[in-house]
Amino acid sequence: MTSNRVMIVTSATEDSLQSVLDAIAGAGGGEIGHYTHCSFTVAGSGTFKPGVGADPHVGIVGEINRVPEFRIETFCGRDQAKGMVQAIRAAHPYEEPVIYLIPLLDEHDL
């Protein structure tokens, strides 16, 4: 069983959400049949503590920060995943955006 599809999960602040979504779509993510720009977004909060040498987009170095963020879930072909990660990093304001790549089962593998 080899997965040809990958779920991509990342997060973005409200001010960067549309830029990240546009980058995902521009790299070919979120396409199902005749539909494009497919994703799921939910509001939540991100927690982090920037260390010495960090230059956070939001938050204060040396303090635990909690900021409103939006979790983004979308998908792409396995062969598109590297380009998708590059597109997200280019559009994302964070120094170290969290990006999860999760192989997906195809219904024919069941």
Residue ranges of each PLM-predicted region?
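Hydrophobic structural segments
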Residues: 1-110
